[in-house]
Amino acid sequence: KHVLLLDSDDAYLPDSVSLLVETAERNKAQMVSFNFETLFPDGSIGERPVEYSFPDVKTSTGHECVEYIYAEHIGYFSWAFMYDRQFLVDLHILYPQGFALLEDALFLNKILRQCSRVAYVSKPCYRYRITEGSLSKRTSLATVDSAFKSLSEIQRIAHSEGSSIRFDAHIVRLYLYIYT
């Protein structure tokens, strides 16, 4: 009934999945955005790598959720959402293939614009492990080219709806991310 994504070196925190399912069903949400904690290579646990605090709301539209991403309250992590399976099937939006970087951003930009209700869980439900040599830390010409393709498609999607000032600032940060 629900779909969760899990990176191979990450983990869901105890009782999180039941909390997410309960939240989705109580709010009749097509997606649930949830908070997470970060496990660093030295073993310490810290804040999530997102600039501002997690949104203090119970539900929103998908468009409002996109604005939370642009304002850096939510990160571009597809694993930080739970999806209603039937919603995914009905949309026919597949996870982008052939992208080495920013595929999460492209997927979320497409799917959130089709989502009428997103619920939020501010309690950390996921442990995101930062590892040395991860794919997101590797820079090659193919990786950069892939990221540019993702960003180009995201810009096309946003501009077709009329992009916001927040989007413009956000896309600049994403371009800078490619180079760091």
Predicted regions and their residues:
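Non-catalytic, C-terminal membrane-associated alpha-helical segments of glycosyltransferases
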Residues: A169-T180
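Nucleotide-sugar donor-binding/catalytic module of glycosyltransferases
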Residues: K1-E161
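Alpha-helix N-cap/helix-initiation sites
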Residues: L101, D168-A169
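Flexible helix-coil transition and linker loops at the boundaries of alpha-helical arrays
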Residues: S160-D168
